[in-house]
Amino acid sequence: ATYKVKFITPEGEQEVECDDDVYVLDAAEEAGIDLPYSCRAGSCSSCAGKVVSGSVDQSDQSFLDDDQIAEGFVLTCAAYPTSDVTIETHREEDMV
């Protein structure tokens, strides 16, 4: 399946199409959207965003705890869309 992923970035909103087997960070990059990242392995917080609406599968990540996930935090480098989803990017500093 292909879903619409909307990124709310400091520069404004941008929407991409993302297959359900593509990480949302990769889909953003392919569309020329510059998002923060570091490890690309789901084991740090550089790429952290927050899900505003919709859902993702981020079972590949190993950094966020259950409370952070419940609050909506997402590691974009290790998240597949499972519906149309809106994500606020650049939210690493909000996780502390």
UniProtKB/Swiss-Prot annotation:
Cofactor-binding details, from the entry: Binds 1 [2Fe-2S] cluster.
Chain residues that bind [2Fe-2S] cluster: C39, C44, C47, C77
Major localization class: plastid
Molecular function (Gene Ontology), one example: 2 iron, 2 sulfur cluster binding
Keyword annotations of the record: 2Fe-2S, Chloroplast, Electron transport, Iron, Iron-sulfur, Metal-binding, Plastid, Transport
Cofactor: [2Fe-2S] cluster
Cellular-component GO terms for this entry: chloroplast stroma
One Pfam family of this chain: Fer2
2Fe-2S ferredoxin-type domain residues: 3-93
Keyword ATP-binding: no
Domain of life: Eukaryota
SUPFAM superfamilies: 2Fe-2S ferredoxin-like
Biological process according to GO: electron transport chain
Cellular localisation: Plastid, Chloroplast
Function: Ferredoxins are iron-sulfur proteins that transfer electrons in a wide variety of metabolic reactions.
Protein family per UniProt: Belongs to the 2Fe2S plant-type ferredoxin family.
Additional notes on this entry: In radish there are 4 ferredoxins: 2 are root-specific (R-B1 and R-B2), one is present in both leaves and roots (L-A), and there is a minor form which is leaf specific (L-B).
Name the record gives this protein: Ferredoxin, leaf L-A
Species this chain originates from: Raphanus sativus
